[in-house]
Amino acid sequence: MKKEYLKFSKEIKAIIIIILILTLIFGFNDNKPEFILKNWLLNLLYVFILVSMIILFNTLGYKLVAKYLGAEIEIKALNSHVFKDKFRLFKLYKYVFTPVLPVLITLFSNGKFFFTPVGTFDIKDYNIFGRKFPKITYFNHGLIATGGLFFNFILMLIFKSAGLDKGILISSWFIIWQLWPFSNLPGAKIFLASRALYIFSLIFFIGNILLIQSLPVIYAIILSLLVSIILAVIYFYFLEYLKA
């Protein structure tokens, strides 16, 4: 019981850290001609609310898909020790591709460049009774990652219908960087699960992000879905199926 509580507490801390860092990234520059502390703080609060919704939706998506597949996920901030062997000099591993780097980029760019890969998730395998595989597979990992991003996409559509441009902006950059196939990011989990699934996810999400700016939502979804399916099928058939 105590172990589960500590794990839950650790996950809550990670979620709070991720929310605070992303709030700073997207709220640091309020794009006003002059700095007024009151307005800056109000904008920061507004961004905090939007970011909290995005992270909670993302977490909910991961957990629901994981539960369906018989697994449990834990939200984590990117771990600097993953890069300890590659960046030993001056302990650079503490600053390279960890939550520290996005903050530094925000400060040096005056909040005009959004570098958001600060969080990810880990999965603990469980037996899946009644299913073909006794353990969670890499493909299941990819499905969980895709599910979390799909929940973010749904929230982005809600922001679109509500006319919340800031919410669309934050959601877009969050999804884009989560799709990056690097380290332990969700994009890497999808990429390792299936190249075809990764191509589908990449084209579908980024296609929608670009198209909903100029097309009705339903047209953007249909067009992105068709293109992503076609490209994923072409890749799978010519580069995997024929070479198998």
Annotate each PLM feature.
Residues M1-A244:
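Hydrophobic transmembrane alpha-helices and their immediate loop junctions
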